[in-house]
Every structure is written in C-alpha cells, then in structure tokens.
C-alpha cells in the first residue's frame, strides 16, 4: 500500500484499482461452480458460531436488550453490503468481542443514569455510532490507513492475547453462573432448587470440557494416523461445528425426572416475536436523548473508532499477506470509509456494528488458496498425462502445463500472472534419460502428482461470491433461531474457551511467556523443534525483560476493562503502544534485539539436528504426500493467520559470514548455550535414546 496523506487521494486510488477488477471478482467465483461451496461453508461456520456466542454474552450483559438475533443480523447485513460494494472481498465482517465489551460498558453506564436507563440505551448507542462513523470518515479521508505498518507485532500480539484473556474470562464466568440462579427467572421453579442448580453446574462442566477437548483434537485431524485423507480434512475443517452438534445432542440424554430447564439453553426471542424488532425503530427515540449525553457520546465513540481502525486494518492486512501472492490491489482507505457508513447504519437500526474480524479473514483467504490450488492442479495433471501419452519431451510437457496455467489466470491489464515455478535439476535428471529437456519423459520415473505439487505457487481465488454466500447463510440463521435455541449455554462457554486456547499457538508473546516458566535445564527442548529466531539471536535476559514489559502492559489493559466507566478507554492503551515502540523501547533495548523480538513476519529457525534422518526406504513405497490444506496449516499460525518464515541463523555484524560447512549443524549460536543450561542427553550421546554413530564413513561413501 502506497502511503498518502492527501485528502481523498487514498480512497480515489482504492476505487480506481478495485473497479478495474470488479467484473472479474464475480466471474471468477461463478466459474468456480459448486467448488466455491467448500470455502463458503468453511468460513460460514467460522463466522456464525462466534457471533451466536457473542449474542448470548450480550443477552446476559444487557438484560436482554441485545441478543443473538441482533448480532446475526448485523453480521449478515454488513457482510452482504461489503461483499457487493466493499473494496477487499477477502475481508470478513462480523460482530467481534471488543464490540461486545464496549456495548457492555455503555449499557452499564446508561442503566445507572436516570435520564437514559434501559429504555434509551439503544438510542444513546445510536448517537455513539453516529460520532464513531464521523471519526472513521475523517480517518479514511485523511489517509490514516497509511499508518497500518506502524502496528508492529508488539501491539498486534498483545491485543490478541488480551482478547484471548477476555474469551477465557467469559467462559469461566459463564460456567460459574451455571451453578447460580439466573437474575430474571422465577426462583420458585424446581430447576432452581440448590440440588438441581448443582446438577446443572456439573453437567455444564461435562458439556463445556467435552466440547473444548474434542474441538481441540479435531483441529489436529490432518495429522492423525487413521482414516482417509478426505475424512481427516473434513474433520479438521468442520470438526468444531460438528462437535457443537454432538454435544448439543448429548445434552438431551437426561430424561425422566430431570427438570426441563436442565441444562440451560440459549435464550433469544424469535425474530418474528413482538419484542425482537423493537430496536429496529430506535431512530425515532434518538431525539429523546438529553443533549448533554448526545455530546458525551463522543467519548465512547472515540474509543470505538480507534478500536475499529486498528482491528479492521489489521484484519485486512492479514487477509492480504504477500505470501498469498494476491494479484488484485488492496483497499484499506475505501474499506475504512465504508465501515463508517456501516457503523452509522447499524447504530440507526439499533444493532451492534460489525467490523473486520481475526482470524476469520485470513482463514477465508487460506480456504480460497486451497480452492485455487485444486482447480489448477486438476487441469495440470490432465495436461501432463495427455502430453506423456503423446510421447512429449519434458520441455514440451512443461511448456504445455505453463500454457494451461496461463489460460486459467484472470487477465489483468496491470499485472502479469506469476507463472509456474522452475523445474528442479533433480527432477530433470530423474525423469529423463540424458538430463536434457528435449529427451522423452520416462513415465515410470515421472510422478505427475508429486511434481506438479512442487511446481504450483500459492495462489488465491480472489472473488466476491464466497463472501456473499456466507453472509447470506449467516442471515439464514436468524430464521433458524428456534433451532439455535436448542444449543446449551454451557456448550457456548466451552466454545469461548476453545477460541481462547486456539488463538495462542503462533503468538510469540505467549511463546516467550512459556519460555520464562521453562526450567533452565529443560530449555534445550525448545531448540529440538522449529522455533522463533529470537531464541538463538537474543540473550535470555533481554527476552525476559521484554516479556515482563509486555506482560505488565497486558495486565494493565486487562485490569482497565474491570473498571466500570474507565474501562471504555482500553483501546487507547493499545494505540499508545505505537509511540512506546518507536520512541521508548529503543532506549532500553538494542535495535538488533528489538528487530528480532518485534519482527514484521513470523520467522522460524529450523530444529537442530539431534537425531538421524529416517531412511526413505523405511517409510514404505506407498507413503502419501501431505495435501495442500495440510501444508498450508503447517505454514500459517492460528492466532493471526500469518505465514511462518523459515530462515537461516542470523549473524551479528562483528562476526564473519559463515560459508558452507558440512559440519555446520554442530555449530550453534552463542545464545543457544544460554538456553541449554546443560547439554541435552541426546546431543551428548549419553542418553538412552541418543543417536548411534553411522556405520558408513562419510568420506568413503561420497567417493
């Protein structure tokens, strides 16, 4: 994205770039046919279940003023509008946890003011949305999105861990409430007797932990040893919503003398009931709000605008990572302007606004990368087999595949397609008799399936159809509210805990916290797997000090959310991290260390070679290669949807650049010694499972 602070310049450039490919955004999705339903269904479940959970949370926090009907309606309406006239169609919109927190603060404030009360809460929140939209308009017009690159890893990961803590807090709070009687229920009912409250709470623990454990296990289904590839992929992609259905079914097992209200279930009015559509006419009541509160609404509006500016921009950034090789232009400024209009519309309708969400946005891009991979792969395999039947040479075969690849690319005037990767020398030697591209292909040696996997670059099917369809499906959930009310609330608390835990892998802040609690004598185990590069390049004392600073800042933000009125200010602390990172931290940490600890990309160092490689013959000749979804899962973090970058060990300016050495695997960074504490038993050769020396003499075997 080109930085520009000229008013309207960024919006104009975004519109110009996206209008050039608007037609292809629709035709590309339509040409995909029924295949587009797979990523559509995948992202629908990833969007709908959290929104339903947030609706239950809002129902409890706002005394039933806002429910799942409103959160689903907001997600559907904003998603449909954005998919049609939005700039970046890969961006997924939805009601997010920060919005729920801000609306909870505003409701508690309005409830405690006689001039507002519960009745004028939605009218006052409408004024908050009016102010929020005006601030977003100003930010978009002035090109504030040009600062998106200033949001470094420090701010992003701290914000992600804060959201994870709030998710877990809500899960724990919800489970504790399962042992208590609800505030708005008749306490004389049999299900609210002490013995039945205890039974409800214990059953809630079973359902919550059951969903949590099985959902976490299903996410790793692609690495299971059992089942076919398509079955493991199905469980990995749709296992979480499937587990929601399974544990909802388990909740209906108790019968007989068990009261009807056990376990407690999702409460929300049906969309056609009288009380469900009162908020749609809230615009009529906005003039009843006292003028002092209309002006005062600017304060929470500023916090929400800052929050949306940060969250929406980062979600769009993660959906457009350079590793996805997107060919169509970005649209940060225009999308922020559109978000202002959507926020205004939601405020006037009396529903909570939606904004770009993480990790659904990068998940959407990843699912479309899988779709594009499948479409290209099928055509290239057919082309390769046809060329081999015609006794074509390897050069002709590669040229035919390149032609088919170019034919399947969307013709863009301003950008050429990337093209297939180059053939590897080992492929040429293995598949031809003479090592010449003009030689005929040896069909017995040329593995079409595997070789094409190596040639295909990562690409994304950039289109609008999947975003539109998933938003329409979310809207269909509003009509299915009688079915949604069959879900136990305890299952939703388990899902909150799942979202909190699932967001931790890939968060380097969390990984450093775990490193601090690792015994010094066991720190070497961190090096036995792929690990972040700072583990080898930054002294442990510096890592500890940096992590303690982040933890203190995180606890300050989390503690602020507990303060009734001042809690609305927590987004300012997140934004304040930008000047803190730029001007304050360099005074306490070396710039080289900060660059590694606050890297722009998720960089990984390879595992140190503590064990001998397993000979390929021992794996068997029928070993299957990982599918494209499994490969992408290994490369992308769960917390923010980032690509992991494997890089070589870094050297300081005071050391000479190392040249290739066959014994280089035995040379470690000086910082590795600090981490070890004591040498690994496997490395020293004294442990029970330490590798035995190879019987082959390297010098003789190479001759």
UniProtKB/Swiss-Prot annotation:
Transmembrane intervals: 36-56, 76-96, 121-141, 156-176, 196-216, 234-254, 290-310, 338-358, 481-501, 558-578
Entry annotated with the keyword Transmembrane helix: yes
Cellular component aspect of the GO annotation: plasma membrane
Major subcellular site: membrane
Membrane topology: Multi-pass membrane protein
Annotated InterPro entries: HCO3_transpt-like_TM_dom (IPR011531), HCO3_transpt_euk (IPR003020)
Parts of the chain on the Cytoplasmic side: 1-35, 97-120, 177-195, 255-289, 359-480, 579-703
Ranges where the record places region Disordered: 678-703
Gene Ontology terms for molecular function: solute:inorganic anion antiporter activity
Keywords (A to Z) from UniProt: Anion exchange, Ion transport, Membrane, Transmembrane, Transmembrane helix, Transport
Superkingdom in the source lineage: Eukaryota
GO term, biological process aspect, one: monoatomic anion transport
Membrane side Extracellular: residue ranges: 57-75, 142-155, 217-233, 311-337, 502-557
Subcellular location: Membrane
Keyword Transmembrane helix: yes
Family, per entry: Belongs to the anion exchanger (TC 2.A.31.3) family.
Functional note: Probable boron transporter. Boron is essential for maintaining the integrity of plants cell walls.
Name assigned to this protein: Probable boron transporter 2
Species of the source: Arabidopsis thaliana (Mouse-ear cress)
